[in-house]
Amino acid sequence: MTRRIMLQGTGSDVGKSVLVAGLCRLAANQGLKVRPFKPQNMSNNAAVSDDGGEIGRAQWLQALAARVPSSVHMNPVLLKPQSDVGSQIVVQGKVAGQARGREYQALKPKLLGAVMESFEQISAGADLVVVEGAGSPAEINLRPGDIANMGFATRANVPVVLVGDIDRGGVIASLVGTHAILPEEDRRMVTGYLINKFRGDVTLFDDGIAAVNRYTGWPCFGVVPWLKAAARLPAEDSVVLEKLTRGEGRALKVAVPVLSRIANFDDLDPLAAEPEIDLVFVRPGSPIPVDAGLVVIPGSKSTIGDLIDFRAQGWDRDLERHVRRGGRVIGICGGYQMLGRRVTDPLGIEGGERAVEGLGLLEVETEMAPEKTVRNSRAWSLEHDVVLEGYEIHLGKTQGADCGRPSVRIDNRADGALSADGRVMGTYLHGLFTSDAYRGALLKSFGIEGGANNYRQSVDAALDDVANELEAVLDRRWLDELLRH
């Protein structure tokens, strides 16, 4: 019989995704057939699954941890925010429409069927399924029709372990408050809790464990320290961009403007791992550094809206001066579209302005269209003469004079554009920098020897390290029962 466990958080960003990945790798290392599952995810960091649809990149990483091919059924409902009030809805890997918050609330009962169908598919033949919740089950205003947390857990009869983040403070109140506010039906699903991101002497929290037990009756299944290896894993949420620090004194400064609807920002993780790169995330209100050698404009879920914001920050003028000084620019997906002369949206797909002038650094224009490209791709960089693998997730078609100088060839077709002076490059291909050969060639073009480290191998090693750290601190009896053959 397939065993199931669900990690739900006392809030967002408590570390559920990493813990699920770590448990998946721990189970896989012990010979179990383990699968990750997340009923509903909200993220603009999407991946193309091995069966050709869109899922959250956290579930893609968890599949890697489980050593199984990724599937659309691992994340049957993916919400991709396009504005403060509306999201694109992806169901079992395919776009199913758009909805605002209240509209989506009405849709949730209909989506439960797809969630349960996917859960059954994932569970078939598995020894263990590790499920990840979303946000917090204590948001009882969202409980009616819920498919992300307790609504799913009660329907699928999956036991729940709560995760509390002690690093942000107030973890006892978060756990006890969650117990107090949950209805009895939901409270019965909780079997215990984990404390995550603990720093220092764990025995200092013994009284805290006793207090939580006194108020809730829940056992503690482990106090997890701050997992250093997790820093080597791709990040899921853009909130981490606020926590990144600069690495001064390195050979190349790479500046990345933080867009309001930034998407697939984990494209940049391999650059952050390079010892000779100072990766700087430029936040609203700050200029693009004048000493940057390279500016990377990442993907966006709202190209026109982010382009308007880009200009409002004065980054367009910063970028022009950067190029005049001899600096280089790479635009990926939405960033590529912004670099052109014009972006139009005649059908109102993005829900905002219908046309806007681009940054004018590439002689191309983009028109948004409803057909969405979603695929894994093998490519050849014409600029650096290396083979690489990546993926495409985009709307719109880009054409113009600079497309006559494509930046890459993807599966024998031209993609992207290169400016006449070679300083500005755009492409729809995500995952460029994950290729060690491409990253090494790029750095070499700046006079830097780099890219020697195998990035994919380093991610895999980090998953092993996270699994080993969890095995050392989790309650042995609970873990043995979870991982029994």
Swiss-Prot record:
Residue ranges constituting the GATase cobBQ-type domain according to the UniProt record: 251-438
Protein's pathway: Cofactor biosynthesis; adenosylcobalamin biosynthesis
Catalytic residues, chain numbering: 333, 430
MF annotations from Gene Ontology: ABC-type vitamin B12 transporter activity; catalytic activity
UniProt KW keywords: Cobalamin biosynthesis, Glutamine amidotransferase
Entry-linked PROSITE patterns: GATASE_COBBQ
Keyword Transmembrane helix: no
Pfam families with a match to the protein in the record: CbiA, GATase_3
One annotated GO biological process: cobalamin biosynthetic process
Similarity field: Belongs to the CobB/CobQ family. CobQ subfamily.
Function according to Swiss-Prot or TrEMBL: Catalyzes amidations at positions B, D, E, and G on adenosylcobyrinic A,C-diamide. NH(2) groups are provided by glutamine, and one molecule of ATP is hydrogenolyzed for each amidation.
Subunit structure: Homodimer.
Protein name in the entry: Cobyric acid synthase
Species this protein is from: Sinorhizobium sp
